[in-house]
């Protein structure tokens, strides 16, 4: 198999077809592989909220297309009605999920295009917004490949790499962030094997990461989240690479719940802990991790699945979707501009000064 041309690395998590957005329904993988159609901002927002699409970069791309879809729906409207309707689309998308900063970054890019073209005819604005959504998606793939090249150099031939959640092609417009690093290392000829945390409660590691790796014949071993420390203590993990949904100005990292636990264990066992992080995921307006909003999801994700209930009825549940890993536990951020070791407020600000 040519890994550059087949498998999830080439799968389009989002695609524009015949005037509508289609997204892989990640809730039903790996049992079924199917695309769902979306024709409005409200539909895309619900797709984000219900986890049809997930992963910070993919959410950002979806939101951009959501704005474009809303503008397409309004192509025949008056200028005033177009403005009201498009603003409604921005609002519903912004309210879909609070933690992934790429959502707001992409909406800001779309709004900048709208602001710069308000003097033009409505049809021209629609064309500009759709072009920008396509550009955001293409940029994401380019950035992921750049990060992958930088990150691949950090992994030794034969490395056993543990990852948490899914930061692969499915979480982006293509190639992936954390899994993009692994893909790039494999494409460079390195023998890499993956240890995938199952990532309770939504099982992104078991359902999505394991699927991506199996499809590409990259060796992968699935473990439950509470096995990670045991494997580290036995010397069976050489490096950890994860993605992120938001990085604060001081380098604190918000990622899928359980990441903090993995980082603490990595420090205890002297294992490098890398975070694959496009610059669009760094939020300089957030001073530190304590200020990052953490989404709390439904109790039903923890107590059971569909018709199977494994927890006692009436039990109280906490279900934060993310946690924060302090910057001092991060060996390096892997960005499209290079590897930033021991990230802090000064070095992160420097990334944006170049």
From Swiss-Prot:
HAMAP family: Salvage_MtnA (MF_01678). Signal peptide: none annotated. The keyword Flavoprotein does not apply. Catalyzes the interconversion of methylthioribose-1-phosphate (MTR-1-P) into methylthioribulose-1-phosphate (MTRu-1-P). It catalyses: 5-(methylsulfanyl)-alpha-D-ribose 1-phosphate = 5-(methylsulfanyl)-D-ribulose 1-phosphate. Belongs to the eIF-2B alpha/beta/delta subunits family. MtnA subfamily. One of its GO terms (molecular function) is S-methyl-5-thioribose-1-phosphate isomerase activity. Substrate binds at residues 54-56, 97, 204, 255-256. This is Methylthioribose-1-phosphate isomerase. Pathway: Amino-acid biosynthesis; L-methionine biosynthesis via salvage pathway; L-methionine from S-methyl-5-thio-alpha-D-ribose 1-phosphate: step 1/6. The record marks 165 as: Transition state stabilizer. GO terms for biological process: L-methionine salvage from methylthioadenosine. It is an enzyme of class 5 (isomerase). Pfam families: IF-2B (PF01008). Keywords: Amino-acid biosynthesis, Isomerase, Methionine biosynthesis. The active site is at residue 245. Gene3D superfamilies: translation initiation factor eif-2b, domain 1, Translation initiation factor eif-2b, domain 2. Its EC number is 5.3.1.23.
